[in-house]
Structure formats: structure tokens, C-alpha cells
């Protein structure tokens, strides 16, 4: 099952990278890798995330990171919509 990212999700990741590079450069690479790897596991378990705030979406909570990935399952595709910091208002 493919897991494409929307342009908005890709932009979210770029903002996360920029923030981490500026404030926590020693954590940037490992954090981004963990985000990618955890999202990749949705292929095997697409319903792993909780029901999302918007109808038809789900939210993947990262156990060791303060981020949430919003996604939707559409046909045979899992589409990553956004990545939020857990403290961020949506």
C-alpha cells in the first residue's frame, strides 16, 4: 500500500527540519528518520492511528517524539496530510 505525502505534509516536515536544525541540530537527523520510519510502518497497519479530528482522517502518535501525523486511508493508499507538534493547535 503506497504512503504518499501531500505537499502540506512535506512542507510541515521542512518546517520541523528547519526548527530542529536551528535549535537542536544534534537531534534533527534522528528525529526525521524516526518520523519517516514510523510513518512507513502504516503500510503494514493502516488503522494503527486513532480516529482524527476531521472526518475520514486518522492520527498517528509518535511514541518517542512530540509529533502527530494526520493521514487518511483512501482506496488502497495511505495519504499523509500533515505533521503537527503535539502542543500545536490544529
Regions found by a protein language model. Name each.
Residues 1-2, 90:
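Absolute protein N-terminus
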Residues 2-56, 77:
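Basic, Lys/Arg-enriched alpha-helical interface segments
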Residues 11, 62-64:
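Short coil/turn motifs at beta-sheet boundaries
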Residues 41-42, 63, 83:
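Conserved catalytic core of Hanks-type protein kinase domains
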Residues 50-51, 62, 71:
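Sterically constrained small-residue positions within well-ordered secondary structures
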Residues 54, 64-65:
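Structural motif corresponding to alpha-helix initiation and N-cap regions
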Residues 57-61:
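A beta-hairpin/wing motif
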Residues 67-68, 72-90:
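Enriched for short, Lys/Arg-rich terminal
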Amino acid at each position: 500500500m503506497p504512503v504518499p505525502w501531500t505537499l502540506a505534509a512535506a512542507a510541515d516536515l521542512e518546517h520541523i527540519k528547519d526548527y530542529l536544525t536551528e535549535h537542536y541540530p544534534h537531534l534533527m537527523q534522528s528525529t526525521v528518520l524516526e518520523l519517516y520510519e514510523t510513518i512507513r510502518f502504516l503500510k503494514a497497519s493502516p488503522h494503527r492511528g486513532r480516529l482524527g479530528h476531521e472526518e475520514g482522517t486518522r492520527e498517528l502518535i509518535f511514541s518517542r517524539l512530540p509529533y502527530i501525523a494526520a493521514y487518511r486511508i483512501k482506496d488502497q493508499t495511505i495519504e499523509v496530510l500533515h505533521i503537527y507538534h503535539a502542543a500545536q493547535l490544529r
